[in-house]
Regions:
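Short beta-strand-to-loop elements that line the ligand-binding cleft
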Residues: 52-63
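Alpha-helical segments flanking ligand/cofactor-binding loops in enzyme cores
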Residues: 21, 68-69, 123
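Secondary-structure junction motif
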Residues: 10, 27-49, 119-120, 136
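A late-sequence structural motif
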Residues: 97-137
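Beta-alpha-beta core module
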Residues: 12-17, 65-114
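Active-site-adjacent beta-strand anchor residues
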Residues: 30-31, 60, 78
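Flexible hinge/capping segments at coil-to-helix
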Residues: 3-29, 33
């Protein structure tokens, strides 16, 4: 999703949530070059008909909490996962805009060797991932 500060300007834009053509006029804060999130954001924007060469990327930041704080403070807008923006959207700190024609997510693979003795914390992590995503053996 695209995130913006919850200001009057973006509240007005939020009324026509399907049109994000205005993104080219905004200062954009992105994840660092090479990150999976940045690659996915680029793919989703291209699918929505946005020319990536016309984007005004003002910062590349590695930490998504820093990105959210920067957006809240009005430095620019950004694209992060829906899940990462959920809390701030619920509290009203940020507005979220779905990216039109976007995929509903990306595949993340969990790979491990069943024959390798894992730590208890690794076993718990795998169990939680399987429960959350409904993965069966």
């Amino acid at each position: 999703v695209m995130i913006t500060p919850n200001t009057e300007k973006y509240q007005v834009l939020h009324q026509n949530i399907e049109d994000i053509s205005w993104i080219s006029e905004e200062c954009l804060i992105m994840r660092e070059e090479g990150s999976g999130t940045r690659k996915e954001a680029g793919k989703q924007l291209r699918n929505a008909g946005i020319n990536l060469d016309k984007l005004k990327i003002i910062a590349s930041i590695e930490n998504q909490e820093t990105i959210k704080k920067s957006v809240k403070q009005g430095m620019g807008i950004s694209i992060i996962s829906r899940l990462a923006a959920e809390e701030e959207a619920k509290s009203g700190d940020l507005l979220t805009f779905p990216i039109p024609k976007a995929d509903q997510g990306r595949d993340i693979n969990l790979v491990y060797n069943k024959n390798y003795q894992m730590s208890k914390s690794a076993e718990r992590f795998i169990k939680v991932v399987k429960e959350v995503y409904g993965i069966e053996e």
